[in-house]
């Protein structure tokens, strides 16, 4: 599991400068680990998840006015248009049905010059150990709806109206493709 810890340290190192002094929406926060690691970098973090149990766990030890946790549906966010400088959706697009619909909602709440950051497990490149972990995730209630290679995932983002400005594949037991994106202007 040391490999996973190294990959997550690399992920946080990539995220910190991208959220520096920004207003951030994190979707699918789970237990809030990303939001907790970015607290010193961002001006404010609105961290959401569809699971009340996950949000309850994330709120434990949350003593900062810079961070707020709430239960929200990523397909129907309650925020005004262009509310956030950065939207982060980490390790979630591969487990939700119709991830392209979530991208439409992220576009709506993201400022025109904002950044979507979407690190996602790219299961199609799994090792046998990674395949076993993917099976364990499915059994735990996180079924794979999309199984991408890194290249296919980046193409998916581009096909759905995003310009990928930066991408890195982090070596994890399941490869983690980090993508920073900007909105493509609609005509």
Language model features: what each stretch is:
Residues 100-112:
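A short glycine-rich, Lys/Arg-flanked "PGG" loop and its adjoining helix->strand segment in the class I
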Residues 75-86:
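A short acidic, Gly/Pro-enriched loop at the edge of an enzyme's catalytic core
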Residues 86-98:
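A short SAM/SAH-binding and catalytic strip from SAM-dependent methyltransferases
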Residues 160-162, 166-187:
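Core SAM-dependent methyltransferase catalytic element
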Residues 145-160:
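Short alpha-helix
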Residues 25-27, 31-76:
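Class I SAM-dependent methyltransferase SAM/SAH-binding core
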Residues 1-12:
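Conserved SAM-binding loop and adjacent beta-strand
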Residues 117-140:
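Conserved class I S-adenosyl-L-methionine
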């Amino acid at each position: 599991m040391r490999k996973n810890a190294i990959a997550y340290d690399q992920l946080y190192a990539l995220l910190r400068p991208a959220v520096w002094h920004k207003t951030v929406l994190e979707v699918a926060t789970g237990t809030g680990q990303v939001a907790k690691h970015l607290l010193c970098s961002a001006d404010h973090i609105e961290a959401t998840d569809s699971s009340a149990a996950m949000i309850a766990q994330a709120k434990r030890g949350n003593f900062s006015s810079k961070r707020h946790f709430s239960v929200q549906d990523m397909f129907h966010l309650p925020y005004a248009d262009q509310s956030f400088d950065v939207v982060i959706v980490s390790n979630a697009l591969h487990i939700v049905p119709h991830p392209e619909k979530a991208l439409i909602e992220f576009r709506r709440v993201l400022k025109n010059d904002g950044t979507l950051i979407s690190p996602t497990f790219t299961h199609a490149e799994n090792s046998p150990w990674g395949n076993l972990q993917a099976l364990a995730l499915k059994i735990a209630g996180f079924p794979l709806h999309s199984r991408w290679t890194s290249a296919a995932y980046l193409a998916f983002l581009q096909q759905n109206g995003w310009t990928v400005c930066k991408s890195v594949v982090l070596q994890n037991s399941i490869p983690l493709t980090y993508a920073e994106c900007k909105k493509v202007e609609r005509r």
